[in-house]
Amino acid sequence: MREIVHVQGGQCGNQIGAKFWEVISDEHGVDPTGTYHGDSDLQLERINVYYNEATGGRYVPRAVLMDLEPGTMDSVRAGPYGQLFRPDNFIFGQSGAGNNWAKGHYTEGAELIDSVLDVVRKEAEGCDCLQGFQITHSMGGGTGSGMGTLLIAKVREEYPDRMMCTYSVFPSPKVSDTVVEPYNATLSVHQLVENADEVMVIDNEALYDICFRTLKLTTPTYGDLNHLVSACISGVTCCLRFPGQLNSDLRKLAVNLIPFPRLHFFMIGFVPLTSRGSQQYRALTVPELTQQMFDAKNMMCAADPRHGRYLTASALFRGRMSTKEVDEQMLNVQNKNSSYFVEWIPNNIKASVCDIPPKGLKMSATFIGNSTAIQEMFKRVSEQFTAMFRRKAFLHWYTGEGMDEMEFTEAESNMNDLVSEYQQYQDATAEEEGEGDEEEAEGEAAA
């Protein structure tokens, strides 16, 4: 049944991944040793989407863990669910990528990539009907961005018809880990535009804001941030894992969300987000969930959907609720806020309903939006990129690994093209029938 192979790369990817497996194992009643302790057959019915059943009834994640230094992997192995993973699926180097995309993509990462691909292949062969791959990684570092995109390109080559879904942590506007983030991120976007099917854009600052403002956590840890992301990843694939009234899977999502092949960068959100103290006082209704879901404060990336328009959106509900009510609410949102949806795609919200809510909640919803406002993220990175690239600052770290300046220029213009494509569709109206083609032709000539 529709399995998904999960790959986590680099420090950020491995930390998000580790948290994700905690959340999923909890949902399926799998304890840290891989033994099932659940209370419902539904947990086991499609557990094989993410788990392999090994001898003695142990459930082993279909996960591949990669990094260019052993540190993060050691802490995953020592973490609460570290013994769950198959030991051969930890692949790590010793050198580290030193936040250098070129090291991850061309030198250090390229040396390790074949052993990673062997494990990915082995996991894929263990599937009945592989649906696709999901990858958690960051865009600002060296391993997750450089080696992550290298792996995506290689897997794409070998499995061209399987879905490739990434959860990519973009550099944040205010908090920066490394000076060369704009370089690494731009080079990665360049790759993701070509090789990924769906990119869920996440950034730490938006996650901090959610923890701080909505969840009222005074000092949010990365664990708290990663928990938010895990809730989303779990929501996206919940329809594959539990029975539902309106199903969706990675491919249906893609078909419904991507009007033009390059525009596959999505904003994600999860509701209900309530602080730990006030959880028990809130009875949730479908209208409340829907209203919260489209709230800009709940978006997990620092782009404001009110500054753009939704091309498409998808709402994945979980819990016992009437589908009629869900449909009404979706229509209601589109009618009330019609200016925020492009009018040349009628009914552009896809909804799905899965009967089993996540642990501790009566109902929840995951939101995935394809909004033109995402261009804010790319613009911001692009400006920082240009500022440094104009002076050729830090370039020697990349050229020293055998990269060419040309590749930087290409990545920069590809990202700027992406921004103007989003802008073009934000401004497009249903009336301009014949004009669109001429505009595009001019645009290509200009590019």
Swiss-Prot record:
Disordered as annotated region, ranges: 424-447
GO CC field: cytoplasm; microtubule
Keyword Ribonucleoprotein: no
Biological process terms in GO annotation: microtubule-based process
Swiss-Prot/TrEMBL cofactor(s): Mg(2+)
Gene3D superfamilies: Helix hairpin bin, Tubulin/FtsZ, C-terminal domain, Tubulin/FtsZ, GTPase domain
Subcellular location: Cytoplasm, Cytoskeleton
Binding site for GTP: Q11, E69, S138, G142, T143, G144, N204, N226
S-S bonds: none
Top-level taxon: Eukaryota
Keywords: Cytoplasm, Cytoskeleton, GTP-binding, Magnesium, Metal-binding, Microtubule, Nucleotide-binding
UniProt biased composition (Acidic residues): 429-447
Family: Belongs to the tubulin family.
Role according to the record: Tubulin is the major constituent of microtubules, a cylinder consisting of laterally associated linear protofilaments composed of alpha- and beta-tubulin heterodimers. Microtubules grow by the addition of GTP-tubulin dimers to the microtubule end, where a stabilizing cap forms. Below the cap, tubulin dimers are in GDP-bound state, owing to GTPase activity of alpha-tubulin.
Oligomeric form and interacting partners: Dimer of alpha and beta chains. A typical microtubule is a hollow water-filled tube with an outer diameter of 25 nm and an inner diameter of 15 nM. Alpha-beta heterodimers associate head-to-tail to form protofilaments running lengthwise along the microtubule wall with the beta-tubulin subunit facing the microtubule plus end conferring a structural polarity. Microtubules usually have 13 protofilaments but different protofilament numbers can be found in some organisms and specialized cells.
Name listed for the protein in its UniProt record: Tubulin beta-1 chain
Species: Cyanophora paradoxa
